[in-house]
C-alpha cells in the first residue's frame, strides 16, 4: 500500500486530494500545524480513514522526523500562506512558509530517502504581470505579491533539487481553483456566501473590489487529479493546470445571483478597499501539455462550478437558519 504525506491537508486542496488518494488505496498521512484551534471541518468526514500528525514547514527537525517515521512513497506539499492580501501584511512569514518551507521538505526527503516522489504546488500568481498570454510552462515569471514571489522560489528550488540530486520532484503551476470548500476570504466564496445570505434575508448587499478582474477558474476536485498524475509519470516535470478560459468577477456574480433568480446589479457595491496594491494581469492558462502528457482535462465547467458553490452555501445557511 503506497503512503502519501499531504502538507496543508486541512485546506481545500488537501481535503480533495486526501479523498482521491483514499479512493486509490493509499495510506494518507496529513500534516497540520500545531495551533490552539485547528480547523478540521474540511476533513472531518475523513478523520477515521487518515492519520493527522503535527508538523511545521518552518521547523526542519520536525520534517525529518515526520519523513523518517512515515516512510512515504509520495509527498504533496500543499501547505502555504496562500491568501494574497495577507502576504502583504505578513511578507516575511509568507516567505518562511511558502518559500523556505519547500527547501526544508526537499532537504528532509534528500536526507531520509531521495527516492520519495515530491509534488510542489506552484501557482499562476507567479506570472503576475504577465509577459505572454496564455501562460504556459515556459512563460517567464513576474510575481506581483509576496505570495507570488515566495511561490517562484518554491518552484525553482523544486527544479534545483530535481536536477542536482535526481529527486523525482514535480511542480504543478495551478491556476485559480475553487469549490464549496474554498475559504470565505477568497472572492469566489465571498460571492457565493453573500448570494446565499441575501437570498435567505441574512444580508442586503455584497461589497467587492475590482469587478473587471479576470481569472482562469476551475474546480479544485479536478485539479488534485492532475497532481496525482504528475507523480505517476516516468520523469518529473512542470505542468500548467487550468481550464484555458478566463472569466471576470462580474461574470461570476451574474451566474451566482442568477442561480437564485436575483440581479447582481441590485446588490453588488464596488468598494476600493478591496482592490489589490498591485493587480495581476490577464491570467489564462495553456494546459495543453497536461492534456498531452498526463491525459488530464477539467471536467467541471465554469457555470457548473459557480452553481455548485451557490447551492452548497444555500444548503449550509438554510440549515443554520432553520
Predicted segment positions?
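Conserved C-terminal active-site "lid" loop/helix of NAD(P)H-dependent oxidoreductases
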Residues: 220, 272-297, 315
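C-terminal "lid/loop" region of Rossmann-like NAD(P)-dependent oxidoreductases
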Residues: 206, 210, 237-239, 247-254, ...
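Residues in well-ordered alpha-helical elements
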Residues: 60-64, 73, 85, 92, ...
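Small-residue (primarily alanine) positions within well-ordered alpha-helices
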Residues: 79-80, 154, 226, 285, ...
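NAD(P)-dependent short-chain dehydrogenase/reductase
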Residues: 130-134, 144-146, 152, 156-232, ...
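N-terminal Rossmann-like NAD(P)+-binding domain of SDR-like oxidoreductases, especially those catalyzing
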Residues: 1-177, 231, 300, 309-315, ...
Amino acid at each position: 500500500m503506497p503512503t502519501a504525506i499531504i502538507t496543508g491537508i486541512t485546506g481545500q486542496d488537501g481535503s480533495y486530494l486526501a479523498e482521491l488518494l483514499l479512493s486509490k488505496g493509499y495510506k494518507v498521512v496529513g500534516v497540520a500545524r500545531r495551533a490552539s484551534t485547528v480547523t478540521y471541518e474540511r476533513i472531518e468526514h475523513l478523520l477515521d480513514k487518515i492519520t493527522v500528525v503535527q508538523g511545521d514547514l518552518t521547523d526542519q527537525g520536525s520534517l525529518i522526523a515526520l519523513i523518517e517515521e512515515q516512510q512515504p512513497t509520495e509527498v504533496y506539499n500543499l501547505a502555504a500562506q496562500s491568501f494574497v492580501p495577507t502576504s502583504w501584511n505578513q511578507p516575511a512569514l509568507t516567505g518562511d512558509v511558502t518559500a523556505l518551507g519547500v527547501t526544508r521538505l526537499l532537504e528532509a526527503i534528500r536526507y531520509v530517502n531521495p527516492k520519495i516522489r515530491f509534488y510542489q504546488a506552484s501557482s499562476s500568481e507567479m506570472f503576475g504581470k504577465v509577459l505572454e498570454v496564455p501562460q504556459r510552462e515556459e512563460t517567464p515569471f513576474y510575481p506581483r505579491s509576496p505570495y507570488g514571489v515566495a511561490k517562484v522560489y518554491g518552484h525553482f528550488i523544486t527544479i534545483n533539487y530535481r536536477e542536482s540530486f535526481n529527486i523525482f520532484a514535480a511542480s504543478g503551476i495551478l491556476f485559480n481553483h475553487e469549490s464549496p470548500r474554498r475559504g470565505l476570504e477568497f472572492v469566489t466564496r465571498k460571492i457565493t456566501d453573500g448570494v446565499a445570505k441575501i437570498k435567505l434575508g441574512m444580508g442586503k448587499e455584497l461589497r467587492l473590489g475590482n469587478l473587471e478582474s479576470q481569472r482562469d477558474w476551475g474546480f479544485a476536485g479536478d485539479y488534485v487529479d492532475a497532481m496525482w498524475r504528475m507523480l505517476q509519470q516516468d520523469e518529473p516535470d512542470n505542468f500548467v493546470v487550468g481550464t484555458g478560459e478566463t472569466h471576470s468577477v462580474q461574470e461570476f456574480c451574474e451566474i451566482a445571483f442568477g442561480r437564485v433568480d436575483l440581479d447582481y446589479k441590485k446588490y453588488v457595491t464596488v468598494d476600493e478597499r478591496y482592490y489589490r496594491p498591485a493587480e495581476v494581469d490577464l491570467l489564462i492558462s495553456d494546459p495543453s501539455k497536461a492534456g498531452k502528457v498526463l491525459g488530464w482535462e477539467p471536467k467541471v465547467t465554469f457555470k457548473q462550478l459557480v452553481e455548485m458553490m451557490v447551492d452548497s452555501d444555500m444548503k449550509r445557511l438554510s440549515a443554520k437558519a432553520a
